[in-house]
């Protein structure tokens, strides 16, 4: 399969910004992060556009993924509708501004509220793509499938760099199943995650799906069973700290994210117990 996209990778968390070319449109995903990096993306878009409509898709509303929108004022902006729930995107934009302020980052454009052209509710075909809500990391996360290229841009999941960061573990498992079905049906041959390098080929994609699913199942088992059996929180937390990802101990630099997953699962388990 000939590569039909250009991938830009920020030095901040290896955040990816994909530009996917189709006959009538240019699709830009999550332009990130620092001004010089976004300027490079903008120059590429300008050189490749050739009169085509520019579609800017936000895979989700986390601050490192939305900060570059203002650099592309004539783009049609698309996101999943949950991005507007409970002032979510406003909070994330403010977080981006605080980050920039802390490191004296100056931008040539305003980091402001995007003007959305389309808000996606359910899975749907649109033009030459298929939008698929994949909540779990965030409520508003959305994957985009380019059917002809068999290319799936997923946002913050299926990364080679990190285990699942959980907002809703049940929804996350369901989202993995949605993507797995697409792969098994032969509709996806390459996945671009929000951080890290793409997964190419059925075997690699399914491996990433399975290791993420196993982490979620193991994590849920420790916490949900512990809460159901009235095990002391300290004991459950100690068991949780011993969990592995893909057979390897959790990296120290990701330990805080692992702990945040534990806290989220405690909330879910307590809510389920009632």
What do the PLM-derived regions correspond to, one by one?
Residues 33, 91, 163-167, 204-205:
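Short, solvent-exposed loop/turn segments at secondary-structure boundaries
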Residues 225-274:
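C-terminal regulatory/interaction regions
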Residues 38-39, 43-122:
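Active-site HxH/HxHxD metal-binding segment of metal-dependent hydrolases
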Residues 19, 121-146:
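Core dinuclear metal-dependent hydrolase active-site scaffold
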Residues 173-235:
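Divalent-metal (often Zn2+) His-rich catalytic cores of metallo-beta-lactamase-fold enzymes
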Residues 34-36, 61-67, 84-86, 139-141, ...:
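Active-site environment of divalent metal-dependent phosphoester hydrolases
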Residues 1-49, 143-156:
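Conserved beta-strand hairpin/beta-sheet module of binuclear metal-dependent hydrolase folds
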Residues 29-32, 53-64, 78-81, 133-136, ...:
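Active-site neighborhood of phospho(di)ester-bond hydrolases with catalytic His/Asp-centered motifs
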